[in-house]
Amino acid sequence: MGAAAFAQQQARGDANALALSFDAARLRMVERSDKLAAARIAVEAKELQSEGVKRLGGPVVSISGLAYAYNANLNLDLDPLNQKLGQIGSSLPPSIQGFISRVPIPQLPNSYTLNRHDTGANASVSAVWPLYLGGATDAVRGFVSAQAREAQADAEQAGHEVDTLLVQRYFGAQLAQRAATLRLQAERTIAQHDAAAQKMLAAGVISRVERLQASAAYEEARRNARKAENDAALAGVALARTVRAEGSVTPQTPLFLISAPIEPLGHFIDAALTRHPGLGKVAAKKAQAEQLHEGEEALRRPQVIAFGTREIKSGNADWVAGLGVRWTLYDSVDRNALSAASHKQVEQAERTDLQARSDISLLVERNWRALDNARRQYLEMKVSVELAQEVVKLRTAGLREGTSTTLDLIDAETNQAKVLTERAQAANDYVQALAQLLESAGLSETFSDYIARADVKVN
């Protein structure tokens, strides 16, 4: 693709692109980010769980009922009884035996089947109220509440991460587009010099070697321009996907820099130690460990439960009510060991908190120093930019006067594009370092405030 064709395609793309300021891009990302949506859903799920166990330990009232029908058969063997009846007469006095022999005694059947069948129904209402469970219900509620706080910390961390990702892709697209524009301008200018060198060769002003050097420089400029074009296209796709745009996106907020130092290091360390979601997550983990320990201790205490049940029927209904007490005196499980283990988990969480505070403070300091270094680097490159511009002017005048060659001018313009690109890269380094610093301090939402404070815009 030639320079003219690329310029036409870029113009068409800009006309159809969605123009977004950084704040607009952030709002769009927050509304459409699947990562943030997943984090919010996780928080809502934990909050619902916490709400679900809010009344844990209260009374439980239930109603039960049954209906039944039965049919029962019992088969009786009467042969032994018949035999006994037959033997009764021989054991009586002779006078009675004669009388009985004249009276017919009925014979029982060999067997007889008894049948019982009936239908019925029963209903009752029951209530159970744990009066004291040793603190187990409070431990469960506290554990679920701590899980909700952990999910909230994860959601806050996800918010900081997507903010930093947006800065990377938004201003990365700005940098890539600026680099492509500078490389395109260099390609156009060097193309003109290449054409002029061809005419100078035909006129015998320069040698064939000088002509080939100009052609090689032009080919290198073309390769650099095409690479920068592809990089800009890829950066644009990444930005569009981040903000969930159907087509391309044109960033409207330029790379920026605050020439004066920002707040001191202590400001960001203090903010990090109170706002960093990583510390909130560690605190939630510690609370969970504490509640697990309380749950273990609750199993060592007595449990008192009130209960009652009553038949649902009119008249004289059956009912029962009472109190139940349970206290485990001996258990095959070593409760002391389990209690010590849960206490160790609390100690582990405390140590993790101390380590996290140290790591976060170090991370904040590293990012703060990287930001200040990027600021200094950008400001110090001003001399390099001015030098590159002056060299281009000098080589242009020298070419007219015959004191410079076409290759000298091409080298000067190539170097100018390189220096301008490097300075834009330094501005992007500053912006990315600022985003990293704010994320590590838990202040990502204040990024736009620093855009408003910027006194240097890299257009």
Regions found by a protein language model. Give the residues of each.
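Small/polar-residue-enriched beta-strand and adjacent coil segments characteristic
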Residues: 21, 60-74, 78-157, 280-356
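Acidic, low-complexity, intrinsically disordered peripheral segments
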Residues: 7-14, 67-75, 79-87, 422-459
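Alpha-helical heptad-repeat coiled-coil segments that mediate oligomerization/polymerization in large
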Residues: 207, 360, 367, 402-406
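Regulatory alphaC helix of protein kinase catalytic domains
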Residues: 10-26
